[in-house]
Design a protein with these regions (language model features):
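Core catalytic lobe of class I
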Residues: 2-177
């Protein structure tokens, strides 16, 4: 798929990749033309990063500007995959619920102000190389264990998105027979 008026950053026989501000590029993509959107937006971390990240209290509103475009460009059975890490509540050894709030808002019906997505499945990316943060609760006070998991949300505008699990199935072990 080509974006009219834009030069791909690189191309393969599988498609094109574009480099730019997604809020400027997304409106140039025709309606209902994309099968899969896979994104890992900046997480709502406690410390501000050079690449820019939004505070957890503002995250849902910030993400919704992208979500509207995602819903517009996805094919009816297309999928939106969002890899999003958790964060902590400042000053407390408790987790923020911002990524759950985001999924609830994405899955809220359009008539109620949401985007009308369905949650097909939540997956988990285990990353043992993640730093032990926040240090105060993990390495200093030792009240929490290291967070080594990101949630990967699989959403679709249809309860039956285009999918086929045959490429990831593993044979059952002898113990299961």
């Amino acid at each position: 798929m080509k974006i009219i008026g834009e030069i791909p950053f690189f191309s393969t026989n599988l498609g094109n990749a574009y480099l730019g501000d997604s809020l400027e590029l997304l409106p140039k993509i025709p309606d209902k033309t994309i099968d899969l959107i896979c994104t890992s937006p900046p997480f709502a971390l406690l410390r501000q990063k050079a690449y820019g990240n939004v505070h957890a209290d503002e995250y849902v509103e910030w993400f919704m500007q992208f979500a509207g475009e995602f819903a517009r460009i996805l094919k009816p059975k297309g999928s939106l995959i969002v890899d999003i890490g958790g964060t902590w509540v400042k000053g407390f050894p408790t987790r923020s619920l911002y990524h759950y709030e985001l999924v609830l808002e994405l899955c809220k019906p359009i008539a109620e102000g949401g985007k009308g997505f369905y949650l097909a499945q939540e997956l988990y990316w285990y990353n043992p190389a993640k730093l032990p943060t926040p240090a105060e609760w993990v390495t200093v006070r030792r009240e929490r264990v290291k967070d080594a998991v990101n949630t990967v949300w699989w959403l679709s505008l249809d309860p039956h998105p285009k999918a086929n699990n045959r490429g990831v199935l593993k044979p059952y072990s002898e113990q299961c027979h």
